[in-house]
């Protein structure tokens, strides 16, 4: 019988692609979800998953032993569940609550994995945010690698209502919790963190554009008619969600002793997105923001070479990612 993988948060953007990648490579999948309506929406687009995937409801990832039942009998755990704002417009989630959900959710997933003797590896979906924070605090030209850590602290996050700051500290502390758990408990399994930047690509887990996660919401604003001219870029590196899913699959069995991998498809700016959208979907030129003419707005670099060397990853071109993301969002909005 093929090996069984537990994915937390399977109704989310990242985890739904993770499940698709695992199924395509012959793994059995068990996924946790929080809300029935989100699972129903996912299954409308993937009805075959009703028979292919086991689903376990976990209403609160902070509850004691939240994932213990879900982890019974599994060979691997991918912790992808996260609580983060869908967008930057009201109503927003309490940023202080997000901090504690991130930490406790990760620890509970680790506790469950440690109680299941079959588990070989635990993969945590961290973030580039755990490396650098909401902005580059390390100076112009810094090259971020697996050695870097966001310098912002829990106290700074708790004293701030800045949602992006809180999110970056969430990801840092969630990942720190993973490394600390391993150091403290020396479990049988190996734990690996993946640190992706802004995650883009096609969406298939939703029924409308009303509940997009942050990264796809950001992308949607550039092509839906909100802006006449693209705003200045605030995010400078991306990865295709399908490449991140492949990274998770490879991280389960790769021959590596590393516990952290920077994941990145490369640098981009907002003009790159709108130029691709205009090239492939000229019928929506009145909705797509015009390029703003930025040259090189990013003042840092991200080195993802370890993921290529140790995990054997290849990253697809940005044009493919942006084209497929644009097409899927227009279809989701009923425009194609």
Curated annotation (Swiss-Prot):
GO BP field: cellular detoxification of methylglyoxal; methylglyoxal catabolic process to lactate
EC number: 1.1.1.-
Pfam families: Epimerase
Stretch forming the signal peptide: 1-21
Annotated residues for binding of NADP(+): 38, 167
Keywords per UniProt: Oxidoreductase, Phosphoprotein, Signal
EC class of the enzyme, as a word: oxidoreductase
Source superkingdom: Eukaryota
Residue numbers carrying Phosphothreonine: 153
Disulfide bonds: none
MF terms in GO: methylglyoxal reductase (NADPH) activity
Family matches, as SUPFAM superfamilies: NAD(P)-binding Rossmann-fold domains (SSF51735)
The keyword Phosphoprotein is assigned to this record: yes
Protein family according to the UniProt entry: Belongs to the NAD(P)-dependent epimerase/dehydratase family. Dihydroflavonol-4-reductase subfamily.
Protein name (database record): Putative uncharacterized oxidoreductase C1773.04
High-level lineage: Eukaryota, Fungi, Dikarya, Ascomycota, Taphrinomycotina
């Amino acid at each position: 019988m093929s090996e069984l993988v537990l994915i937390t948060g399977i109704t989310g953007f990242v985890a739904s692609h993770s499940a698709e990648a695992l199924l395509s490579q012959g793994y059995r999948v068990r996924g946790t979800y929080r809300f029935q309506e989100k699972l129903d929406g996912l299954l409308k687009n993937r009805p075959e998953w009703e028979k292919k995937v086991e689903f376990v409801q976990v209403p609160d990832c902070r509850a004691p032993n939240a994932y213990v039942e879900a982890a019974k009998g599994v060979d691997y755990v991918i912790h992808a569940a996260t609580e983060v704002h869908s967008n930057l417009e009201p109503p927003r989630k309490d940023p202080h609550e997000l901090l504690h959900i991130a930490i406790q959710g990760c620890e509970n997933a680790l506790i469950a994995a440690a109680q299941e003797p079959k588990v070989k590896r635990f993969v945590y979906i961290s973030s580039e945010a755990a490396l650098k924070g909401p902005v580059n605090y390390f100076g112009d030209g810094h090259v971020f690698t697996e050695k870097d850590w966001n310098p912002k602290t829990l106290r700074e996050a708790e004293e701030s209502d800045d949602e992006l700051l809180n999110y970056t500290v969430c990801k840092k502390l969630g990942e720190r919790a993973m490394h600390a758990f391993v150091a403290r408990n020396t479990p049988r399994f190996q734990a690996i963190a993946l640190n992706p930047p802004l995650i883009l690509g096609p969406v298939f887990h939703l029924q409308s554009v009303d509940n997009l996660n942050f990264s796809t919401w950001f992308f949607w604003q550039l092509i839906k008619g909100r802006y006449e001219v693209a705003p200045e870029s605030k995010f400078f590196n991306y990865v295709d969600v399908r490449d991140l899913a492949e990274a998770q699959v490879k991280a389960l069995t790769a021959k590596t002793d590393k516990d952290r991998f920077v994941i990145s498809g490369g640098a981009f700016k907002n003009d790159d997105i709108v130029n691709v959208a205009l090239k492939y979907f000229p019928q929506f030129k009145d909705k797509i923001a015009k390029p703003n003419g930025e040259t090189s707005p990013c003042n840092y670099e991200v080195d993802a070479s370890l993921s290529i060397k140790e995990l054997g990853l290849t990253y697809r071109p940005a044009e493919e990612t942006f084209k497929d993301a644009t097409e899927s969002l227009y279809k989701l909005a009923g425009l194609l």
